[in-house]
């Protein structure tokens, strides 16, 4: 019985806390989303080039002894 009460109380507190959350406006949400999308498009090619370069360097080093 006590365990069920604790679970119930926990979810009641969670519900109360959701009312205190300051949710972003639509404008803020769109702006944040655009920042993330632009960052992904900027950093993806950089990661691709770095990965390809490291791969080629490792292949070169591993094939030296052959």
UniProtKB/Swiss-Prot annotation:
One Gene Ontology biological process: protein transport by the Sec complex
Topological category with respect to the lipid bilayer: Single-pass membrane protein
GO CC term (a single one): plasma membrane
Listed transmembrane segments: 29-49
Molecular-function GO term, any one: protein transmembrane transporter activity
Keywords, alphabetical: Cell inner membrane, Cell membrane, Membrane, Protein transport, Translocation, Transmembrane, Transmembrane helix, Transport
Presence of keyword Plastid: no
Superkingdom per UniProt: Bacteria
InterPro entries: SecE_bac (IPR005807), SecE_sf (IPR038379), Translocase_SecE/Sec61-g (IPR001901)
Compartments where located: Cell inner membrane
Chain's role: Essential subunit of the Sec protein translocation channel SecYEG. Clamps together the 2 halves of SecY. May contact the channel plug during translocation.
Similarity section: Belongs to the SecE/SEC61-gamma family.
NCBIfam families: secE_bact
PANTHER family, per the entry: PROTEIN TRANSLOCASE SUBUNIT SECE
Subunit organization: Component of the Sec protein translocase complex. Heterotrimer consisting of SecY, SecE and SecG subunits. The heterotrimers can form oligomers, although 1 heterotrimer is thought to be able to translocate proteins. Interacts with the ribosome. Interacts with SecDF, and other proteins may be involved. Interacts with SecA.
Protein name as it appears in the record: Protein translocase subunit SecE
Native source species: Rickettsia montanensis
Recorded name of the encoding gene: secE
């Amino acid at each position: 019985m006590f365990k069920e009460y604790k679970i119930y109380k926990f979810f009641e507190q969670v519900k109360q806390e959701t009312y205190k959350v300051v949710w972003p406006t639509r404008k803020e949400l769109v702006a944040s989303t655009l920042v993330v999308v632009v960052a992904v498009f900027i950093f993806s090619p950089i990661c691709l080039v770095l990965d390809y370069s490291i791969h080629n360097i490792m292949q070169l080093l591993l094939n030296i002894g052959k």
